[in-house]
């Protein structure tokens, strides 16, 4: 059971899943690392882990713009590339050739450099039905900067990523929750641990998001800054 069939299997194992995104990482100074580790451990070491597969705490981030997922329909620049190169099918489990989006990425990186170095979180709203995460509210300056960036990215990448709502995901659901068909004990135990998680996540209010960049990913557990691949040509 899962709505994330491309990302995770029924055993809670994350699958190969390739694409490009622009994200901002949760602050990871010395004091905050332990908090993030505690979040991951609560998910993995309690009954929560029976239903949700935790993401590594080092990957906790807020998406700024979903650039392109290899399993989705090609965005216009990718579509043009396939026509020009007579490519009949784009592989889902590989990244594109460097030249396909290189110029787009260079322009996008210029826009990212204009963002405030720290985006300030003012409020978080917990969700749990398809995954464990929080909807993010930013302060006015940060929100306006992100809104401007997204408009610029929509021009650069030729799509508007209209369905994105600012959020941070900590785990994906892979097994049906017991609230409908489970025992009373299961329901109570899971609710107790989820309430602990909510309290823990509330400590993230007033944190910041940093290290804005374009990342390549090959699963929901592995993100690579674009500089890792193209440092000589994009910096």
From Swiss-Prot:
It comes from Invertebrate iridescent virus 6. This is Uncharacterized protein 127L. Gene3D superfamilies: Cyclic phosphodiesterase. It comes from the Viruses. SUPFAM superfamilies: LigT-like. It holds the Pfam family 2H-phosphodiest. InterPro entries: 2H-PEstase_DUF1868, Cyclic_Pdiesterase.
């Amino acid at each position: 059971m899962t709505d994330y069939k491309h990302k995770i299997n029924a055993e809670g194992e994350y699958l190969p899943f390739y694409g490009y995104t622009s994200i901002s990482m949760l602050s990871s100074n010395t004091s905050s690392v332990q908090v993030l580790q505690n979040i991951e451990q609560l998910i993995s070491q309690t009954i929560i882990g029976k239903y949700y597969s935790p993401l590594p705490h080092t990957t906790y981030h807020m998406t700024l713009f979903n650039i392109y997922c290899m399993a989705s329909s090609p965005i216009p620049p990718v579509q043009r590339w396939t026509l020009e190169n007579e490519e009949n099918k784009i592989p889902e489990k590989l990244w594109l050739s460097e030249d396909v989006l290189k110029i787009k990425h260079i322009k996008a990186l210029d826009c990212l450099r204009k963002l405030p170095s720290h985006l300030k979180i003012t409020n978080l709203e917990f969700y749990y039905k398809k995954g464990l995460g929080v909807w993010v509210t930013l302060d006015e300056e940060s929100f306006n900067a992100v809104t401007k960036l997204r408009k610029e990215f929509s021009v650069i990448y030729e799509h508007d990523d209209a369905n994105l709502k600012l959020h941070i995901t900590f785990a994906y659901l892979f097994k049906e929750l017991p609230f409908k068909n489970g025992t009373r004990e299961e329901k109570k135990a899971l609710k107790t641990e989820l309430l602990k998680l909510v309290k823990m996540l509330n400590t993230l209010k007033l944190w910041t998001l940093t290290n804005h960049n374009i990342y390549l990913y090959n699963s929901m557990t592995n993100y690579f800054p674009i500089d890792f691949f193209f440092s000589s040509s994009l910096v």
